Regions:
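Beta/alpha (TIM)-barrel catalytic core signal, keyed to glycine-rich beta->alpha loops juxtaposed to Asp/Glu
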Residues: 1-128
Length: 129
C-alpha cells in the first residue's frame, strides 16, 4: 500500500532500489478497501481521519461518474518505475474490469482533486500488528 492515491511514499525509495538492482512490487492499489465504494472492513487498521478522507474522495469520484476503484488502479500502475502492481478479487468480473481500467487513460485532474480531498491524511500509515 505504498503507491496509492492516499500514500505514495514508495517513490521516495525508488532511486535506492534501482541503485541496488532491486525490482519493486506494489500491492493493494485500493488500500485494503480505503479506495473503494464498498468502504473499509471494520478490522481495517487505518486511523479514522484517513478513512473519512478516503470516503470523501470516493464520494467525490462517484459524483464525477468515475469510480474511485478505477482511478485507484490507474494511479497505482501509472509509474513506469514500478514494474508490478498486485491486486486481488474473488470476483472474475472485477478482475476483467480492473484490466479494462488499466488500459484506459487516467484523469490526472481528478487525481489532483482526490489528493486535495485526502489533504493532510496523504501518506498517513498505520501500525501493522
Amino acid at each position: 500500500c505504498q503507491y496509492t492515491l492516499n500514500d505514495d511514499k514508495l517513490v521516495d525509495f525508488l532511486d535506492y532500489f534501482e541503485e541496488k538492482g532491486v525490482g519493486v512490487i506494489n500491492a493493494s492499489p485500493f488500500a485494503m478497501g480505503l479506495l473503494s465504494q464498498r468502504g473499509v472492513p471494520e478490522w481495517h487498521p487505518a486511523p479514522a481521519a484517513l478513512v473519512e478522507a478516503c470516503r470523501k474522495a470516493s464520494d467525490y469520484c462517484l459524483s464525477q461518474g468515475y469510480p474511485i476503484e478505477k482511478l485507484a488502479i490507474q494511479y497505482s500502475v501509472s509509474n513506469p518505475r514500478i514494474g508490478t502492481t498486485l491486486f486481488s478479487s474473488a470476483n472474475p468480473d472485477n478482475v476483467l474490469k480492473n484490466i479494462q481500467y488499466i488500459e484506459e487513460p487516467i484523469d490526472w485532474d481528478l487525481v489532483a482533486k482526490v489528493k486535495e480531498i485526502i489533504g493532510d491524511q496523504q501518506r498517513v500509515t498505520w501500525k501493522n500488528t
